[in-house]
Amino acid sequence: MGSCAAVRAMRAVVWVAALYPVLFRARPVEALAANWGTRALHPLPGDVTVRLLRDNGFDKAKLFEADPAALRALGHTGIQVMVGLPNELLVSVAGSVGAAEQWVLQNVSSYISKYGVDIRSVAVGNEPFLKSYKGKFEAATLPAVQNVQAALVKAGLGRQVHVTVPLNADVYESLDGRPSAGDFRPDIQGLMVNLVRFLLDNGGFLTINIYPFLSLYADPNFPVEYAYFPAPGSPPSQASVQDGNVLYTNVFDANYDTLIAALDKHGLGAITVVVGEIGWPTDGDKNANAANAQRFNQGLFDRINAGKGTPRRPQMPDVYVFALLDEDAKSIEPGNFERHWGVFNYDGTPKYGLRLANGRSILPARGVRYLSRQWCVLRPEASPSDPALAGAVGYACQYADCTSLGAGSSCGNLDVRSNISYAFNQYFQSANQQKNACAFNNLSVITTTDPSQGTCHFEIMIDTGRHDLTVASAAAAMTVATALLLLPLLSLVI
């Protein structure tokens, strides 16, 4: 997801309130929008990513920060851009109009004037009112929005670039489970009203993130069918919610309309609501797989293509799919699935078939260069019980992505030797296949025989030209979540 916040415990309202936002605005059905995250050890080159977007009909892209390479690549492409101001800058921007003006100059004005980037909006913060933040950004968010708006006006961009705040669905709730009873969370009700009023008065819009997958992840008793969009003509699931004359057959509609009811209740129903993130991961959890992701996202694209909205907002909103690509350097604090939200793999290959706008099929990235066809695996004569292996595997997974080894994941059924080989290879590929990255106490060897098996794919990393990269300097230190992931694996090799 956009933020690293841990998944929140859900009350009864989880069935209607645990979704991430989709952009709601009139647009032709052939127009699609996607989140382009860049937290990867080997990011797909900007020009390749832009070509991938255009080949598949995406004409809007959302960036979580003003990534220079991504923004330059988006110049003169016709793709409309939402650029993010990260949470860590909220306090400084809130406290100084000058800081806001400097940020706008460096990250908005310059890219519009020098590179021809079609920046249409600035996302101030990302889910700043999450309960898990315990109010950390509440005082700074609205002043930051006001200062960024003032900076855009001063730069002559007040009509061209609009301000928004992407919010998590935990900012509103329904105490009895009916969308019509929706209201803002009591502790931030006044803040939400003031924020939305400012956005409405200044031509901005509201962005909401909705994740049906998280409803299922957070509650083992959540009705599975309610997480998906029902197929046309199919009977409603038993979990459907009756709200007066309206029957809600899926959690997205119920969640979105809970927000709309909250806005209407406070006289703010005129605000445009954009869904900033919605999607389904393909790995890292028993419910995160390609089949489930294909089912959910195809239902989503079918809704977009049909222009079908929700009972309270019949016109389908703009939807920023989360995400375009996998990101192997993201925090896994929310869960091991966090690195696997992409519709495309890290290299731009589709994970599953999809019918996009106008019935077109999903297309892979073009012009991707790969490293040599070789892998690092456990040496055949090495014993899995070698005492040096636990430390070697732990080190490999500290600096590379081993989330696919978790229970219920794509590589969760490997035997001990293959588990170790997978960890070794992930580190080897992340280090650009440097020979010394396959030197685990003489327990590993480089092979040209593909060790992939079943659903578990042993990667060959894309070639970014950065052959002096060392993984230890490029990856974040091991988190508690990573350590917990490794415990079952390490127990096998101790």
Identify what each model region corresponds to.
Residues G2-K62, Y370:
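Boundary/entry segment of secreted carbohydrate-active catalytic domains
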Residues L32-W36, D59-L63, V81-L85, R120-V124, ...:
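Hydrophobic faces of well-ordered beta-strands that scaffold small-molecule active sites
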Residues G37-L52, G98-I112, Q189-V193, R303, ...:
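Short, acidic/polar
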Residues A40-L44, D59-R72, L89-A100, L130-K131, ...:
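Acidic-and-aromatic substrate-binding clefts and catalytic sites of carbohydrate-active enzymes
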Residues V50, Q146-A150, L157-V165, Y172, ...:
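Substrate-binding and catalytic surfaces of secreted/luminal carbohydrate-active proteins
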Residues L52-L53, A73-L74, Y111-K114, L199, ...:
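Generic structural signal for hydrophobic
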Residues A70-V171, G177-D187, V275:
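Substrate-binding cleft of extracellular glycoside hydrolase catalytic domains
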Residues T470-I494:
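Cleavable C-terminal sorting propeptides in eukaryotic secreted/cell-surface proteins
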